[in-house]
Amino acid sequence: MSPKMVAPPTNLHFVLFPLMAQGHLVPMVDIARILAQRGATVTIITTPYHANRVRPVISRAIATNLKIQLLELQLRSTEAGLPEGCESFDQLPSFEYWKNISTAIDLLQQPAEDLLRELSPPPDCIISDFLFPWTTDVARRLNIPRLVFNGPGCFYLLCIHVAITSNILGENEPVSSNTERVVLPGLPDRIEVTKLQIVGSSRPANVDEMGSWLRAVEAEKASFGIVVNTFEELEPEYVEEYKTVKDKKMWCIGPVSLCNKTGPDLAERGNKAAITEHNCLKWLDERKLGSVLYVCLGSLARISAAQAIELGLGLESINRPFIWCVRNETDELKTWFLDGFEERVRDRGLIVHGWAPQVLILSHPTIGGFLTHCGWNSTIESITAGVPMITWPFFADQFLNEAFIVEVLKIGVRIGVERACLFGEEDKVGVLVKKEDVKKAVECLMDEDEDGDQRRKRVIELAKMAKIAMAEGGSSYENVSSLIRDVTETVRAPH
């Protein structure tokens, strides 16, 4: 990295295109605020449904004189074969609609370009999700740079790169090899996974999915650079190696969640929480330091009623306080809660029916463990809070993130899931985790033995590094300065 320089306030205008999924939208809004705090004008373009999700956060930012605006584009859902009104990945009936929402995203290209041409001041730079490949073409026509936002960290991104370039994901292998464990070659650590865990699916990618992915990869190659929500001290060897293999500008500017400093911002990131900040903190304040297990399986993962009941029975058996965020409740599960479970755990279990204020909860000193689906936002938020994890991956990047948590960082314990469960397949998959598995993993993570102490020490040290990285003079702070300088030089350069 170049010598530390204080970047002067910028007057650049960044336009951000987040993917229509909670886990991609939330960090993009954080990035918008980080850039606006440096003086930039930022426009976020998304669908009405997602604009409504983040409007309170943006309104608070505007009230502090940050130059951020939300503009809406209507997703042509029915034209793309989606159910009417479906604007988000978490609204999809099943993963099989992935192709349709990709089509709907492609249909945004022309109206988005028309909107960009009308903006005043005109845009200087586009930052868009990896899965918006057409923004590279739009940026080229507007003669401005496009930066790619990659949701996961560099460990995952490098693993995928290695898997593709070494032909581990090639089509010439017998189908049975999908479940055989393979070692990813050339990595700083020995990482052994199955092919299906690499792609994070219950089946190999089909032609359409691979086509979409490769189109996004080609668009990334033609982009100006890559923005990653990580910090260099978390995964230094993977950051350096990924920069090398991509041979492209890259800025690690995370953990972006640390831009949330006030109670309302911590409590309302994305969807409105189903519990108030006051009630949540009051409950936590009454517990012992490091005693509470937080359980949340993300914004997209779904589990069957039978699996949820098994998880609940496991939580009941651990005899520790817990907060359980429960989403997508079926009638069967609602009945089970009312038939005695909530009453039995009332003194030590807080059930949040809906969205939980995750960063607020994780940053509370009474939280001693996090049972997580291993989405990257949850992973880095837990690290930032200094909380060790129990890993329960479902799909996408989550199995590789689990390997990073358990094998590379050594700050987590596996619950023991080996196969993916795509949303929409939860009833077919059934119960993968028994109540005994829950109890065993919690005891392993939170007991006061030497392994547990070492995990806690490691994650607390990483949390300190995260905060230093985001503070003035830290690596991520300097990388934001570098990003602004690089874009400024490109925009000002004669064409």
From Swiss-Prot:
Its EC number is 2.4.1.-. One of its GO terms (molecular function) is UDP-glucosyltransferase activity. It holds the Pfam family UDPGT. InterPro entries: UDP_glucos_trans, UDP_glycos_trans_CS. Keywords: Glycosyltransferase, Transferase. Gene3D superfamilies: Glycogen Phosphorylase B. UDP-alpha-D-glucose binds at residues 299, 355-356, 373-381, 395-398. It is an enzyme of class 2 (transferase). CDD domains: GT1_Gtf-like. It comes from the Eukaryota. May glycosylate diterpenes or flavonols in leaves. This is UDP-glycosyltransferase 73E1.
